From Swiss-Prot:
Post-translational modification summary for this protein: Phosphorylated by FAM20C in the extracellular medium.
Name the UniProt record assigns to this protein: Versican core protein
Protein function: May play a role in intercellular signaling and in connecting cells with the extracellular matrix. May take part in the regulation of cell motility, growth and differentiation. Binds hyaluronan.
Glycosylated sites: N123, N204, N332, S407, N425, N477, N513, N563, N696
Record-annotated disulphide pairs: C63-C138, C87-C108, C722-C733, C727-C742, C744-C753, C760-C771, C765-C780, C782-C791
Domain EGF-like: 718-754, 756-792
Gene3D superfamilies for this protein: Laminin (2.10.25.10), Mannose-Binding Protein A, subunit A (3.10.100.10)
Domain Link residues, every copy: 1-38, 44-140
Renumbered residue ranges of the record's region Disordered: 251-288
Gene name tied to this protein: VCAN
Similarity field: Belongs to the aggrecan/versican proteoglycan family.
InterPro entries the record matches: C-type_lectin-like (IPR001304), C-type_lectin-like/link_sf (IPR016186), CTDL_fold (IPR016187), EGF-like_Ca-bd_dom (IPR001881), EGF-like_dom (IPR000742), EGF-type_Asp/Asn_hydroxyl_site (IPR000152), EGF_Ca-bd_CS (IPR018097), Hyaluronan_bind_Proteoglycan (IPR050691)
């Protein structure tokens, strides 16, 4: 309801301000008045009376006798605006009793103008009883406004086509919308079996379900037919994801030299890209995993389990002295990141002493519960060289060229058999989880020249942990392993691969035979070579009590230095499989990552390293031993309680890691060789981020006990940006996904409520009071006869027939006279002609009288 003079009972929700009040959304059963709008009057409203007046029914009949009807409230209001004035109450069509007042008279509405209403009760509720007697207001339409209203002729009966009118409103609606909205994808719903019987009886009806549905996807016209039989629909090509919350797509590109052109992937052809149809998550049918193997040895392996872990190895061969590494893009669904084509990282390595062949083995590990079998295989590039040190490694991120994408939900995930794709679809993700995978470059030489010897699994070091780098060097076996750990953050609703660097700081220390336990575990152990070359081993894992499912992987590296003279290290294998752990009561649920070096002598030694790595920034120290004896190196991460890194939004275009120093001491039982410290500086191009030394962002902290050698990975939740309440001057902080919003108290503005503005700008004072602004406050200087904080209370009233406005009393005289007579009349009343001093006073005078009025000669019109 509108209000101009707030008073008791008329405050509403405007806190004493003039305006339109509201009670909010109310129940339809509640009763209130109604506000109507009338534009113009298309007829005449006239007044009827009789000596004995009329009841409501008599008034309606009397209007009918006049070829009219009872007027509505809107029609009477429009007539009043046109100057209709009648100081007699009369019936209206809604059984209310009203009369219009155009000329203010004391005996007619108390001197007020408008349409006056007669109520039954003092609280202005209820209309008079219908048997009460009043005059009547009738309405008669003008003849020129009459219009001919034609009635539609009933159509002929269509009994011969009883089902012709039965159509699917969804299809009719989509048929109208699709030509105008080419980006809408239509989803057809099957009719139930009950409707099929009715459709058979309708020979003339159109079968909507068999009509090809036209789809428009990015402007391309696709026609697909939705089968009528639900069983036929289930025969479409689909991939089932049992116990999977987030299906991940894997796509890769293989690069081989001319000698190995026969190595092909069965899932990288363009034709098979078109074969990808749909995903059916709820069902638990076995899914087929197409694993890339050598075409001469392996074709395809079907994993016989509903949920399984897959180790997929991407291979890249080259004949030159530099290592080629496939670019990998990671999907960070929580933060938009610009194009990552220009993000590169360089690692300078010592020159190779002899020409050698290298290949990159990137292992992708996904977990699903329960797990029974794992098939792993990796070919080995044979070469007669005895020492292998790659010159340099230059990983480059290429957009959608070679990409490896997965996520690490603990409940399990699958890898789609169709590799090439250009989009990433994520289903429901309840919270952000973390998965780490390594980029591993492996250099190995064997004594055979045959390329078909695939009886040994390459040593692919797999670590799961915070973003960091660990370099294990085994001079004796000439096997160099480098690992770069990268974190993936997933967020629902985002698409496409993006890149985001994440920080990690750690000190590395390793006493003898210690075991490091992480929040996610990878186990690598020996894969026993069978007599039949080229056949992978199946590693069994027994299910445990499914009290709580935790994706656990373990790592175990077996070293055998007995074949030192052969120029290689045998007995190295990898097995990766998830396990199920049942947590005990009262214990913290942690999983373990066991890394043990057996067959070699180890000495307690600690080194320290602190580095920050981003996506594809595999920067690592390359330690060149000074002796040809068999050295061993063991290390484990150790917490650095003084350093935490936060990754927040900023304008800096680069993140430069501080100069770091890694000292590694390689000892042997016969000869102790010391590797000189290696100093390196890392610079990672990350345009939308900056690195600050703070503890506000999510970090991974690793607590290490030197004696028990057991660490726990603690996942710290996101920061509460409103914890310190950055809002000033009493503002309220509300956190958002990326920042916070301050809601300021009256009188302040700005992002942090730091600006003090004029509180009197909104004119909070009432009844013509003057507002005085202060520091975070204001004060109202009231006119005479008004009190209150906002001068809203009137303590004095005017005489009968006078109207009060802003402390002054006004009286309207309807009869016309000259200016001199008007001035004398005002003097006789102890007043003077009105002086219009404000726009509000002008509006008040216009409301009091609808005719022209004399005012003071020295005044101007507002």
């Amino acid at each position: 309801y509108p209000i101009r003079a707030p008073r008791v009972g008329c405050y509403g929700d405007m806190m004493g301000k003039a305006g339109v009040r509201t009670y909010g959304f109310r129940s339809p059963q509640e009763t209130y008045d109604v506000y109507c709008y009338v534009d113009h009057l298309d007829g005449d409203v006239f007044h009827l009376t009789a000596p004995s007046k009329f009841t409501f029914e008599e008034a309606a009949k009397e209007c009918e006798n006049q070829d009219a009807r009872l007027a509505t409230v809107g029609e009477l209001q429009a007539a009043w605006r046109n100057g209709f004035d009648q100081c007699d109450y009369g019936w209206l069509s809604d059984a209310s009793v009203r009369h219009p007042v155009t000329v203010a008279r004391a005996q007619c509405g108390g001197g007020l103008l408008g349409v006056r209403t007669l109520y039954r009760f003092e609280n202005q509720t209820g209309f008079p009883p219908p048997d009460s007697r009043f005059d009547a207001y009738c309405f008669k339409r003008r003849m020129s406004d009459l219009s001919v209203i034609g009635h539609p002729i009933d159509s002929e009966s269509k009994e011969d086509e009883p089902c012709s009118e039965e159509t699917d409103p969804v299809h009719d609606l989509m048929a109208e919308i699709l030509p105008e909205f080419p980006d809408i994808i239509e989803i057809d719903l099957y009719h139930s079996e009950e409707n099929e019987e009715e459709e058979e009886e309708c020979a003339n009806a159109t079968d909507v379900t068999t009509t090809p549905s036209v789809q428009y996807i990015n402007g391309k016209h696709l026609v697909t037919t939705v089968p009528k039989d639900p069983e036929a629909a289930s025969g479409t090509i689909s991939t089932n994801f049992p116990q999977t919350m987030e299906p991940a797509k894997l796509w890769s590109r293989q690069e081989v030299n001319p000698e190995r052109q026969e190595i092909e992937s069965e899932t990288t052809s363009e034709e098979q890209i078109q074969e990808e149809k749909s995903f059916e998550s709820p069902q638990n049918s076995p899914a087929t995993e197409q694993t890339i193997f050598d075409s001469q040895t392996f074709t395809e392996t079907e994993l016989k389990t509903t949920g399984y872990s897959v180790l997929t190895t991407k291979k890249t061969y080259s004949d030159d002295k530099e290592m080629e590494e496939e670019g990998t893009s990671l999907a960070n669904m929580s933060t938009p990141v610009p194009d990552a084509n220009g993000v590169e990282s360089f690692t300078t390595l010592p020159e190779a002493t002899e020409k050698s062949h290298f290949f990159l083995a990137t292992a992708l590990v996904t977990e699903s519960i329960p797990a029974e079998h794992v098939v792993t295989d990796s070919p080995i590039k044979e070469e007669e060289s005895t020492k292998h040190f790659p010159k340099g490694m230059r990983p480059t991120i290429q957009e959608l060229d070679t990409e490896l994408l997965f996520s690490g939900l603990g409940s399990g995930e699958e890898v789609l058999p169709t590799l090439p794709t250009k989009s990433v679809n994520f289903t429901e993700v309840e919270q952000i989880r973390n998965t780490f995978y390594p980029h591993t470059s492996q250099v190995e030489s064997t004594s055979s020249d045959k390329l078909e010897d695939f009886n040994r699994m390459e040593n692919v070091a797999k670590e799961v942990g915070p973003l960091g780098s660990q370099t294990d060097i085994f001079e004796g076996n000439e096997s160099v392993t480098s690992t770069t750990l990268i974190e993936i953050l997933s967020d629902p609703g985002a698409e496409g691969p993006t890149v985001a660097p994440l920080p990690f700081f750690a000190n590395i220390g390793h006493p003898q035979n210690q075991t490091l336990r992480w929040a996610e575990e990878i186990q690598t152990s020996k894969l026993e070579p069978s007599e039949e070359d080229g056949k992978p081993e199946l590693l069994e894992e027994t299910e445990a009590s499914p009290t709580e499912f935790i994706a656990v992987e373990g790592t175990e590296i077996l070293q055998d230095f007995q074949n030192k003279t052969d120029g290689q290290v045998s007995g190295e294998a990898i097995k990766m499989f998830p396990t199920i752990k049942t947590p005990e009561a009262g214990t913290v649920i942690t999983t373990a990552n066991e890394i043990k070096l057996e067959g070699a002598t180890q000495w307690p030694h600690s080194t320290s390293a602190s580095a920050t790595y981003g996506i594809e920034a595999g920067v690592m120290p390359w330690l060149s031993p000074q002796t040809s004896e068999r050295p061993t190196l063991s290390s484990s991460p150790e917490i650095n309680p003084e350093t935490q890194a936060a990754l927040i939004r900023g304008q800096d275009s680069t993140v430069a890691a501080s100069e770091q120093q890694v000292t590694a001491r390689i000892l042997d039982t016969n000869d102790q060789a010391t590797v000189s410290p290696v100093e390196f500086n890392t610079e990672v191009a990350t345009p939308p981020f900056s690195l600050l030394e703070t503890s506000n962002e999510t970090d991974f902290l690793i607590g290490i006990n030197e004696e028990s050698v057991e660490g726990t990975a603690i996942y710290l939740p996101g920061p509460d940006r409103c914890k310190m309440n950055p809002c000033l001057n009493g503002g309220t902080c509300y956190p958002t996904e990326t920042s916070y919003v301050c809601t300021c108290v009256p009188g302040y503005s700005g992002d942090q409520c730091e600006l003090d503005f004029d509180e009197c700008h909104s004119n909070p004072c009432r009844n013509g009071a003057t507002c005085a602004d202060g520091f975070n406050t204001f004060r109202c200087l009231c006119l005479p006869s008004y009190v209150g904080a906002l001068c809203e209370q009137d303590i004095e009233t005017c005489d009968y027939g006078w109207h009060k406005f802003q402390g002054q009393c006004y009286k309207y005289f309807a009869h016309r006279r000259t200016w001199d007579a008007a001035e004398r009349e005002c003097r006789l009343q102890g007043a003077h002609l009105t002086s219009i001093l404000s726009h509000e006073e002008q509006m008040f005078v216009n409301r009091v009288g609808h005719d022209y009025q004399w005012i003071g000669l020295n005044d101007k019109m507002f």
